[in-house]
Amino acid sequence: MNKDLTTGKPEKVLWGFCLPLFGSIIFQQLYNIADSLIAGKFVGENALAAVGNSYEITLIFIAFAFGCNIGCSVIVSRYFGAKEYHNVRTTVHTTLLSGAVLCALLMLLGFFGCHKMLTMIHTPEEIMVDSRLYLMIYIAGLPFLFFYNIATGIFSALGNSKTPFVFLACSSVANIIMDYIFVRFLAMGVAGVAWATFICQGISCVLAIVVVFRHLGALQSEKKAVWFSMPVFLQICTVAIPSILQQSFVSVGNIIIQSLINGFGASVIAGYAAAIKLNNLVITSFTTLANGISNYTSQNLGAGKYERIHDGFKAGIKMVWTLSVPLVLLYVIAGRWMVYLFMDSSSGSAMDTGILILRILAPFYFVVSVKLVTDGVLRGSSMMGAFMIATFTDLILRVSIAAVLSSKLGSIGIWSAWPVGWALGTMLSLFFYFRAKKNHFLLKSREMVQIEEEEKLEV
């Protein structure tokens, strides 16, 4: 069911729209966590390290899929808010075609460059074979990753956050069951973990695309949509390319950090792999909520209801802080139990590393959540320059501080770099948002850009 986000009390609208998104990403992260958890419990510490080591490289591919998601989602939201349904369809068609080409290129790069990428991050010899095996199967499933992300972006743009939730809930439960069967009973090791994800993502992707086209069929318009539009493609690129660059540079930064971590041995790698999965559960959840705020912002921008944007910003901050409280308490108080899920009692050093990481990062979720909400408004308003500056500042600081402190303090210096980067990145995002609000750039200038974009699309 499509939902108009331009009417109703902003706080109530956002809670109703974003909570299913939050539930969706929780399920998605659960089956990501299941990969590491089952590998660590039933195959061993090296298997956990191999999956965690490969994960940082998979984030580069996810960055491109996410860029397609947010680029399509923001533009579709704007046209849906403006009731220009023919342009909604044109945007979807254009994204699917361009996404297919991009996916094919990345698959070629991945298949031929897999070993080189693992070597570049100083992957230890004892986990090289498993890391490469996991990564190759993951790359084979890239079409499912891409088209599923595009589909969920379309659902969100149309105000439908419940359908992706149902898909992900079913897929995640199936993935966890298949992980267990493939690894525990069929003894497939790391390959079993990867194939379980491949199969479940494939089924979810096909079902999601079918439902997307059913939803599009319900949008009636006198004007005819086209299968590819260069003006629409360029609009998508103005949002997607900065998002891809931002996510890619973040992934590259994480890979650099992973290469620093790899110098401390398999135990530290395994501890980091467990902790970063738990950390990413929170960060990715907040990022997904911020994407919902981007859709809310973009729909209201398209409808010309500018006064609702700041109300949505304030409601978003309340929402993420409300969710942060139990998550911070859980990680600080029950961190040992959470990390223990990924490994057995013999992995004492790895467990200590994971617990330390969680206790350093968790209190700062209140800070980074503000940045992510602010970034959501900036993206929804197509203020990609400001968004990228704040994000790159965070990234550069984290990588630089990690490199310097790790040589002096050991691995604890790496974990300490995150809060500093988050804090300064948040301050920059808030600065750009309030400057835009004060100067009415967010309101008036974007209205002019929207008019110009509509004129370009007149046929």
Where are the model-predicted features located?
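Small-residue-rich hydrophobic transmembrane alpha-helices
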Residues: 48-108, 145-164, 271-335, 368-382, ...
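N-terminal transmembrane alpha-helices
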Residues: 5-42, 56-71, 75, 100-107, ...
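Transmembrane helical elements of multi-pass membrane transporters/channels
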Residues: 16-35, 137, 148, 171, ...
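Alpha-helical transmembrane segments and their lipid-water interface positions
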Residues: 28, 32-39, 62-69, 73, ...
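Short runs within selected transmembrane alpha-helices of multi-pass transporters and secretion channels
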Residues: 69, 138-156, 164-175, 193-208, ...
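Transmembrane alpha-helix boundary and packing residues in multipass membrane permease domains
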Residues: 21, 25, 37, 74, ...
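Short alpha-helical transmembrane segments in multi-pass integral membrane proteins
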Residues: 1-18, 76-141, 185-241, 297-363, ...
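Helix-terminus/linker motif at the lipid-water interface of multi-pass membrane proteins
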Residues: 30-49, 118-125, 181-188, 248-277, ...
